[in-house]
Design a protein with these regions (language model features):
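Active-site loop/oxyanion-hole signature of alpha/beta-hydrolase fold enzymes
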Residues: 98-139
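A catalytic-pocket lid/entrance helix-loop region that shapes and gates access to the active site
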Residues: 168-200
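Conserved hydrolase catalytic core segment
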Residues: 134-177
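Alpha/beta-hydrolase active-site loop signature
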Residues: 75, 101-105, 147, 169, ...
Length: 327
């Protein structure tokens, strides 16, 4: 190959490299401009509570004899938006509260480690500053089950009951001999680099609730897409994921107080392992001695509230009535 031809190829390669870098930089700039526009277009729908050195976004709806605190699963873009159908159902008879943890929804980021102690402490501080008296009905989804159990064990006088939404309880990993998930540190750059926005632009279905049309409003879905573009896999979510192993070790030995009523919503799952263990047999080990404690299997996604909000609301009303009848 002649020197002249090599020079042309090298020049072409350099131009292509410059072009690709330019496209990347333009996209990153576009993402951050859109982020500013969207933050102005979609302001927080609740109110901010100052906790430690940051602001936590809190949303409340309804009134009633019970205060139900909805707690989100790991990495949920905006718990307030995600729980909207369930809030709408439950707020007809109860006060419903959603506290978005640091790194979620409209809440700030935090430098505090994502230990179970810090996460529960921040939640508790936010609830206290709302001046909403307990005891609360904690209603955790997924990994928040672990935080709820810790809260109930440390502060039993502040918890009236716990209702799990396909929740993760600390003893599950040991029971099924599984390991906690982890997330590579570089994932924290997905949102700042505009990659989350790109993924949503290409196929938003993977980032939106799998619910029937009309369950979530168009505005809700638009805000969910925007917040996902801002926050997906952010540093706090990555830290929380990688802290799960230690958090499970801290909580694996604890259980709910024996007299605390608990209700477990779980996905219908008929699978039984060779050792005879199943989701149902595990949940039976987590039930308390309270006569109202029970397990209710439901058809649906891990995010059961996407499709079963009405059924869940009716079951919780019955559950709370059973508790009151036995007091």
């Amino acid at each position: 190959m002649s020197v002249k031809k090599k020079s042309k190829i090298l020049t072409l390669f350099k131009r292509m490299l410059v072009f690709m870098l330019s496209v990347v930089l333009i996209w990153i700039c576009f993402h951050h401009i859109m982020k500013l526009v969207e933050r102005d277009q979609y302001p927080a729908i609740g109110k901010y509570i100052q906790v430690e050195n940051g602001r936590m976004h809190v949303y409340t709806k309804g009134n009633g004899p019970n205060t139900i605190v909805l707690l989100s699963g790991l990495g949920t873009a905006s718990p307030v938006l995600d729980f909207e159908p369930l809030m709408n159902e439950m707020s007809t008879h109860n006060k419903v509260v959603v506290v978005e943890p640091f790194g979620y929804g409209w809440s700030d980021m935090t430098d505090e480690k994502r230990t179970v102690e810090h996460i529960v402490g921040e939640l508790r501080s936010a609830l206290q500053q709302l001046n909403i008296p307990g005891p609360y009905v904690l209603m955790p989804h997924s990994v928040s089950g672990m935080y709820s159990m810790y809260y109930a064990r440390e502060y039993p006088e502040e918890v009236k009951a716990v209702v799990g939404i396909d929740a993760t309880w600390p003893a599950a990993l040991d029971y099924f001999n599984e390991t906690p998930p982890s997330m590579p540190g570089y994932m924290r750059y997905v949102a700042p680099a505009g990659l989350a926005r790109l993924a949503i632009s290409l196929d938003a279905r993977n980032y939106l609730p799998l619910a029937s049309e009309g369950t979530y409003s168009d505005k809700n879905l638009a805000m969910t897409k925007a917040i996902t573009a801002w926050n997906a896999y952010n540093e706090n979510v990555v830290q929380e994921t990688n802290e799960l192993g230690d958090n499970v070790k801290k909580t694996a030995h604890i259980s709910f107080p024996s007299d605390m009523p608990v209700l477990f919503f779980s996905r219908e799952d008929d699978r039984v392992r060779e050792d005879g263990k199943s989701l149902f047999t595990f949940l039976q080990t987590q039930l308390t001695d309270h006569p109202a404690s029970t397990i209710i299997p439901l058809q649906g996604h891990h995010y059961l509230h996407w499709t079963q909000s009405k059924e869940m609301n009716e079951a919780v009303l019955k559950f709370m009535n059973d508790i009151e009848d036995r007091e």
